[in-house]
């Protein structure tokens, strides 16, 4: 399945049942991740340090357990700091694909990447999202159904994830789309771009454990040992994602643990 996607997704998307049309925009948009403000967390850290120094001066051992608990809670916040990423492309159900060309130009100018290669890599990512969304519609019998139909509404609810599943759904969707993008870059000979894509997500993972794109690392590591194994794992994730975001997410966590 993955081979078929990569072979046609740029040159012949219609063979995958995808529309060739998509939109471009010069707007600069950012997506925010994380929960805690960096300045506030830094301030809290300085306050904890002052309390620690005061306890050391007073030899107040009884206060240490409470301080240790506060430190543990503060440490967790360090891994959930807010940060923003510039959007290069976006897929929205019912609206289609938009590529943010000004953002792509800005990224290429900053890092010296080939514009056409980066542009097409973003298009690969967003078209995989669209292909995935269409597969969900088919699974729920909603392909071609009216937006008022029960099947369509059920598929929409599933696609976005129900409450606590939403974060897991995001990880699964981005893992499938970004691994396809990364592998496309490799196959097209854009090695520096492929490395940059992976490095960006590894750096973000250090700041926020549930950064959705970070799930791609496990598949990339598996690919390094066996292309066939990575392709099988990708197909397995795709099928799992049509019935259970939780099961697909659990499989991604397993892959990340092995890498």
Model-inferred region functions:
Residues 121-137, 178:
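Active-site recognition of the HExxH zinc-binding catalytic motif
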